[in-house]
Amino acid sequence: MAVRLMKRCTCLLREATRLVPTVAPVGRLRLAGVSCKTLTSSVSSPSSGSLAELLGKEQVFTPYPEHQELDFLIEKASRPEQLLELLGSDHSLHHNHAALILIRLSYLLSEKPKEKALLAEDARFQRLVKLVDSQITCVWHGTLVKLLRSLYTLVLPQISKELQSVEQEVRWRLRRLKYKHLVFLAESCASFMKEQHSQELLAELLMHLERRWTEINDSRTLVTMMTMAGHLSESLMNHLEDKCLELVEQFGPDELRKVLVTLAAQSRRSVPLLRAISYHLVQKPFPMTKGMLLDLAYAYGKLSFHQTQVSQRLAADLLPFIPSMTPGEVARCAKSFAFLKWLNLPLFEAFTQHLLSRVQDVSLSHVCSVLLAFARLNFHPEQEEDQFFSMVHEKLDPVLGSLEPALQVDLVWALCVLQHVHETELHTVLHPGLHARFLESKSPKDQSTFQKLVHINTTALLEHPEYKGPFLPASAVAPIPSPSNKKMTPLQKELQETLKALLGNTDKGSLEVATQYGWVLDAEVLLDADGHFLPLRNFVAPHLAQPVGNQPLPPGAKRIAFLRWEFPNFNSRSKDLLGRFVLARRHVLAAGFLVVDVPYYEWLDLKSEWQKSAYLKDKMRKAMAEELAK
């Protein structure tokens, strides 16, 4: 560092020495006049003005010369050999030429790793690198940042003296570089800095980018910064999001796409920014390609940001593109809409027909993605349902046992939701060799997979009487008590309070009933044929892992299960339950219960305790009446 400082001082003093003989006499003449006016005029004279400019502004870099013949030769070179020959020619190289030759070399060899290795051993290349190192303080800013990128792409070793010299020079100049040069470094060099452990340079670069973020005044620079450097600094990304809100009106469709994909990749659910982008997507009739639409659907799905008008537009705009989609794009799109919980029937019917028309191109991974998406949304094709599931079984059954265990469970669970599971598939996942690993694991992911296994076991018990086993062991399906500190939702709390007031005596009903079927009932009551409450504890309860009573149910008596349905349990902007909750309701019915549904949108209309109590009584009467009508 001291050597560099001396070089700069020497350059400054050399220029000052050249100007002093001319300036000094003038200065003496002006001072001899002892006139303030004369002294002022001396400052405006040409010679003293040069000195004032020299002292006021550090002249470190050599002025860039006019475009020379050598510049054209460097630009037009198509082979590394042509560039290396310029070193031994009669051309005079100014301070930038050696760096420009290196930059052009890296461009020509960008996709030729073997030639890069040979070049590193060439004596002319080594001489070129040393020449650049000796002239580094005189290289212009724009050339310097490109030079650093070129040295990274030429894969110089991190211990290389020349590479370290260029990195150090960049660090010296960071404060004086234009913001566009900082952005170029972030765009082209940040990943290399991170990989090659140039952490100090990267940290300083990010610091300057963050300090000067207000200098961003165009959408391209902003989007580039978000995609290339935003993930490296949390505080920088926060500033960039603020800048996005300021410039979002200038964004075109591709820039909006890049911002959304960047947010999705970093799992940054910035609600104000997502709302602003959604507004412009809805209000402006941007022409969007298939790729843009797929990326937008992916980003909104990944961030779970539900915006009705955007979802409607994406579905409507994607529909004409379906004939040109590959099976992979169909699977990706279906998965995105499943995350959004947005079921557009024409779109999903088109997915089904398109996959059936290209069966030979549909791979197992495509089938898995589409099947899981259909199960999440509880989508049953109205046309060609049998053909679709025949294709699914044809692709899935031969390889099901060889798949990753968690994926096996997910796929069979999806088939259970859609009511198209086969006995062989039940046998595959209920085999003791598979469920043992999930039963013993304490990780949340494995526990979730085991819960799906319990649902599959329930499907086999209640909906497939011809299935003879194997089943999960009784000890495995015993319900796990929910934690006492689990926060209750407002609907859950109000429902329990109303039921307690309605039942009065705890013997007449139970709250939060954990069944051996993998589902928890919000409440359970037992009514006789006349609609009067019966004490639950006196009668057998096969749905419990540990029954408490021993008396059979009286003739005409019915068990009633209360199931509340919260807002997240439904498809977006719909009163249709998601597949998981349709399966739960189906299992409870198959277990012999009458179901009283308590959806959030009905409960919100009830204001007084009397209305809530009357609502539940009316629901129970209707359930009993429907059962008698059957």
Curated annotation (Swiss-Prot):
Any one GO CC term of the record: mitochondrion
Location of this chain's protein in the cell: Mitochondrion matrix
Main location: mitochondrion
Organ and tissue specificity: Expression detected in spleen, testis, colon, heart, smooth muscle, kidney, brain, lung, liver, brown and white adipose tissue with highest expression in testis, heart, smooth muscle and brown adipose tissue.
SMART domains named in the record: RAP (SM00952)
Matching InterPro entries: ARM-type_fold, FAST_2, FAST_kinase, FAST_Leu-rich, RAP
UniProt KW keywords: Mitochondrion, Transit peptide
BP-aspect Gene Ontology terms: mitochondrial mRNA processing; mRNA metabolic process; regulation of mitochondrial mRNA stability
Classification via CDD domains: TBRG4-like_N (cd23739)
Residue span(s) of domain RAP: 560-618
Family according to the record: Belongs to the FAST kinase family.
Function comment: Plays a role in processing of mitochondrial RNA precursors and in stabilization of a subset of mature mitochondrial RNA species, such as MT-CO1, MT-CO2, MT-CYB, MT-CO3, MT-ND3, MT-ND5 and MT-ATP8/6. May play a role in cell cycle progression.
Protein name: FAST kinase domain-containing protein 4
UniProt lineage: Eukaryota, Metazoa, Chordata, Craniata, Vertebrata
